[in-house]
């Protein structure tokens, strides 16, 4: 029985050694292929420790095997041992050991000491962040590590996922990630509810309904409600009977007060509503109070914007008659600068506005004495389309007629070389440009050119 016991001790030692080697393997090399993102320093340290541990394990195993090889073989049916080695949740690995007798003693104590040493090394590595294999694919941050971007400070944002997976502890903790992963609150105000406007924007309203809309517009500060109310009033102002009703209800000051708002959409809708109201001559008497303010805002707002176009349309309507043109004479240089700088649509609308002034002979002296950019002459080039050419030719024709009718040709010394008078009358460049347009391919432009040339 003594030799059987010794053989059993040898078998137990080999089983324990094999199990320890398997544990070391699982702790060091048995990693998931999907989780190979490690820091370079940690990899170097782990490789050195794993190498030393594996060398030591091999030496111990050779010692045990050498000692067992000196004994006599026993009956296989008695000495054959089957052991399941592996993690508790992992798949079992069957080891079959054929122990042999040996003459030495104390193998059981040596096996226990070896197992204890390997176990301590495994615990030490686990404490430094070595991971045990997990069946679950879910990874959570350990409580000892700061969450990326959280209060504990900071992992690099580009490596958040890899650092979080590599820094998990041996036990899988079923906890949520830090609060920093939650979506941050938006800095922009969110509209809590929609205002139910009592009418549709294209409804034709009666006087009581218009009064309700004006009351809403006067009391609200909500941009959405203001926009809907202004569009509703602007659409109704397209009808002559409602133009009078809005004026009689005191709607012009209520609408015009929104000219001062900073919201460009609200200003655009305000100008559109006033533009429709300005078709009525009595309404123009109410709107003239705000015409200078509209002109200033139109000149300083963003070039070619919708607000600028709406302002130019309102100014054009307000200058169709001669009653309020003198209120805008101080802005003549700005109009010509806008005529040169603006895009196609801004140019056309500005020309229509200036043509209104040229049709009033009383405004001729102020108009031709203002300073204009010399590049304005480029508007007479053939490259422009029919509408721009017809408008610039009309502008030149009206100014030339007014200079003759007002007798300003004899007082040419009053005007500077940078004035519109010098550009159109004295330089002779305009006349050359107009003569060059006589060969234009557009028949309408040709007819207009011939008409202008006959008046020179």
Swiss-Prot record:
Record-linked Gene3D superfamilies: Leucine-rich Repeat Variant
Q: Keywords of this protein's UniProt record, alphabetized?
A: Membrane, Mitochondrion, Mitochondrion outer membrane, Repeat, Signal-anchor, Transmembrane, Transmembrane helix
Lineage, highest ranks first: Eukaryota, Metazoa, Chordata, Craniata, Vertebrata
Q: Give me the stretches of Basic residues compositional bias.
A: 162-180
Q: How does it sit in the membrane?
A: Single-pass membrane protein
Q: Look up the domain of life of the source.
A: Eukaryota
* Swiss-Prot/TrEMBL GO biological process terms: hematopoietic stem cell homeostasis
Q: Which parts of this chain are annotated as the region Disordered?
A: 37-106, 139-186
Could you tell me what this protein is called? Armadillo repeat-containing X-linked protein 1
Q: Which gene carries the instructions for this protein?
A: Armcx1
Q: Which InterPro entries match?
A: ARM-like, ARM-rpt_dom, ARM-type_fold, Armadillo, Armcx_regulator
Q: Which residues lie on this side of the membrane: Cytoplasmic?
A: 30-456
User: What is the tissue specificity?
Assistant: Widely expressed in the adult nervous tissue, especially in the forebrain, including the cerebral cortex, hippocampus and thalamus.
Where is the protein found, in the record's own terms?
Mitochondrion; Mitochondrion outer membrane
Q: Where is the composition biased (Acidic residues)?
A: 38-50
PROSITE patterns in the record? ARM_REPEAT
Keyword Nucleotidyltransferase on entry: no
Q: Which family does it belong to?
A: Belongs to the eutherian X-chromosome-specific Armcx family.
Note the subunit structure: Interacts with MIRO1.
Q: Where are the ARM repeats?
A: 198-238, 240-279, 361-401, 418-456
> Can you name the source organism?
Mus musculus
| Functional summary from the UniProt entry | Regulates mitochondrial transport during axon regeneration. Increases the proportion of motile mitochondria by recruiting stationary mitochondria into the motile pool. Enhances mitochondria movement and neurite growth in both adult axons and embryonic neurons. Promotes neuronal survival and axon regeneration after nerve injury. May link mitochondria to the Trak1-kinesin motor complex via its interaction with Miro1.
A GO cellular component entry from the record: mitochondrial outer membrane
Region annotation (Mitochondrion outer membrane (MOM)-targeting sequence) maps to 1-6, 26-36
Q: What does the record say about induction?
A: After axonal injury.
